[in-house]
From Swiss-Prot:
PANTHER family: HEAT SHOCK PROTEIN 70KDA (PTHR19375). Signal peptide: none annotated. It comes from the Bacteria. This is Chaperone protein DnaK. The gene is dnaK.
């Protein structure tokens, strides 16, 4: 049987791990390091360099060296090398191929399967791109797993039998996530790890701390009248020096940045010799640190717990070695010290290897349950966002709802898929649209269209729609450019919180209009079907009320719609009384069913419009 590995495909560094005898082992690369820089370079001779060797030659080959490509995953980013365009997937695949080769050299056998980790807040396009990179590298990607979840898996398996809450604070080179997970273990030693909530920022990481130091050094040179902001080689040397200074300041209170012959100007060579203290470094990056607070607090609020309920805090990612980060986490956790027993660079890959072992049947003592970070739904009448899957729902998951048509003899329905937390689709992010055609001619409210959302274990979304009458079906997989960026997700959640009251009012108004429109339609239908049974004065009065309601619906005054609707509801009772009296007089069967009206009130024949769901599940089962 081929071997499966776990891979942490990081922004700045990557790690590969494998199970040996059921226990995870981190594999050293060909250069002897346990972490491999996520750097790819194309030498002038056409050779592809990956890892430490690529990073070392970057200064002399800056235009042909690519770092931090993870930040471009899921976008249309490309780079031209020797008249050939490379996508982010192709560059990432080079790193994965090196990890695969290093693992094969260590194991002495072929590696074909892998579990690859991604930030918890990676969207659908970014997950798809990561999976594609694995496939380009010749790997069968068993599963895409969220990095904090993998870390908790690695950390939580040796915990006690009581249910425990683990908070994972993951600050990597380019991304940031916070996740809360619950770890339980039964008497037989079987562990269940379930994600309770997750939040993050896909554009925040150690690279941003490095850039602040680079900007500071450039400004120091500018004061002396030297501008190196366009000098690519100087910028690369500054980036490398900034990264090294950041690492040194994790253990020292100051460091010296000395770069001789950084550049050459008409006035001669430029040398840089700058002392950087930890205090100055923390001052330069204080706003970056501040950005980590909201996701932390959001996760606590989303899970509905108190900070004191957290049993363990796990720091993941090399950037968590910065003293200011450790101190902030302790402060946010109410004085609780983060766990120091895990290697923040390796714990994610270890968890990925464990999950690979589970999927290959090498470990049978653990179940991993992950979540989707954002709600998914479709647009229904009135522009309402009807959610089928709520955010932080465990995945894989599948949910179906039955909808209907808004007009008589409607031949097709457009299924518009959205992602977000707002009540109206115009405030959310469109993911895609497809059309279900060939619906049999029928009155509005009669056709039943079942819409199904299916999120697989990788967090990738599939949507289908089926006409229950004809059996016709259409489907699509959400891919590529239609997925959300992290900024979009953050904005949506923030907007949803800020506009919750406004959304509630607008939703109520939409519901009133939808109900009023259905009422006018139903009463109109009763009038036409029972024309010969109704006294003229009743018909005249009710018709006038119907027209008043239609006129109100044509306007924008919500109070007028509500008032006209209430008036028609009152007058429609006369229809029921008149029809009932007429049928009794004729000695006919009760007309309630035919007219759609029980005695005393003409209820709409079926309260189904495009904005409403034919609820096939008990209310308490909806998430």
């Amino acid at each position: 049987m081929s071997r499966a590995v776990g891979i942490d495909l990081g922004t700045t560094n990557s790690v590969v791990s494998v199970l040996e005898g059921g226990e995870p082992t981190v594999i050293a690369n060909a250069e002897g390091g346990r972490t491999t820089p996520s750097v790819v370079a194309f030498s002038k001779s056409g050779e592809v360099l990956v890892g430490e060797i690529a990073k070392r030659q970057a200064v002399n080959n800056i235009d042909r060296t690519i770092a931090s490509v993870k930040r471009h995953m899921g976008t249309d980013w490309t780079i031209d090398i020797d008249d050939k365009k490379y996508t982010a997937q192709e560059i990432s695949a080079r790193t994965l191929m090196k990890l695969k080769n290093d693992a094969e050299s260590y194991l002495g056998e072929k590696v074909t399967d892998a579990v690859i980790t991604v930030p918890a807040y990676f969207n659908d396009a970014e997950r798809q791109a990561t999976k594609e990179a694995g496939e380009i590298a010749g790997l069968n990607v068993l599963r895409i797993v969220n990095e904090p979840t993998a870390a908790a898996l690695a950390y939580g398996l040796d915990k006690g039998k009581e249910d425990e809450l683990i908070l994972v604070f993951d600050l990597g080179g380019g991304t940031f996530d916070v996740s809360l997970l619950e770890v339980g273990k039964d008497d037989d030693g079987f562990s269940t790890i379930q994600v309770r909530a997750t939040s993050g920022d896909n554009r925040l990481g150690g690279d941003d701390w490095d850039q602040r130091v680079v900007d500071y050094l450039l400004n120091q040179l500018k004061v002396k009248g030297i501008d190196l902001s366009k000098d690519k080689i100087a910028l690369q040397r500054l980036r490398e020096a900034a990264e090294q200074a950041k690492k040194e300041l994790s253990s020292a209170t100051s460091t010296n940045i000395s770069l001789q012959y950084l550049s050459v100007t008409p006035d001669g060579p430029v040398h840089l010799d700058e002392q950087l203290t930890r205090a100055k470094f923390q001052e330069l990056t204080s706003d970056l640190l501040e950005r980590t607070k909201k996701p932390f607090n959001d996760v606590i609020a989303e899970a509905g717990i108190k900070v004191s309920d957290i049993d363990h805090i796990v720091l993941v990612g090399g950037s968590t070695r910065m003293p200011a980060v450790t101190e902030l986490v302790k402060q946010l956790a109410g004085g609780k010290d983060p766990n120091k027993g895990v290697n923040p660079d390796e714990v994610v890959a270890v968890g990925a290897a464990l999950q690979a072992g589970v999927l290959k049947g090498e470990r049978k003592d653990v179940l991993l349950i992950d979540v989707t970070p954002l709600s998914l739904g479709i647009e229904t009448k009135g522009g309402v966002m009807t959610k089928l899957i709520e955010r932080n729902t465990a995945i894989p998951t599948k949910r179906s709802e039955t909808f209907t048509t808004a007009d008589d003899n409607q031949p097709s329905v457009a299924i518009q898929v959205f992602q977000g937390e707002r009540e109206f689709t115009r405030d959310n992010k469109p993911l895609g649209t497809f059309e279900l055609t060939g619906i049999a001619p029928a009155q509005r409210g009669v056709p039943q269209v079942e819409v199904t959302f299916d999120i697989d274990a990788n967090g990738i979304v599939h949507v289908s729609a089926k006409d229950k009458g004809t059996g016709k079906e259409q489907s699509m997989t959400i891919t590529g450019g239609s997925s959300l960026s992290k900024e979009d997700i953050e904005r949506m959640v923030a907007d949803a919180e800020a506009h919750a009251a406004e959304d509630k009012t607008r939703r109520e108004q939409a519901d009133v209009r939808n109900s009023a429109e259905q009422l006018a339609y139903s009463v109109d239908k009763i009038l036409s079907e029972n024309d010969d049974k109704l006294p003229e004065e009743v018909k005249t009065e009710v018709k006038a009320d119907v027209e008043s309601l239609k006129a109100a619906l044509a306007g924008t005054d919500e109070y007028a719609v509500k008032a006209a609707s209430e008036k028609l509801q009152a007058s429609q009772t006369k229809l029921g009384e008149a029809i009932y009296a007429s049928t009794q007089a004729e000695g006919a069967a009760p007309a309630g069913d035919a007219a759609g009206a029980p005695a005393g009130e003409a209820k709409p024949e079926e309260d189904i419009v495009d904005a409403e769901i034919v609820d096939e599940e008990p209310k308490n089962e909806k998430k």
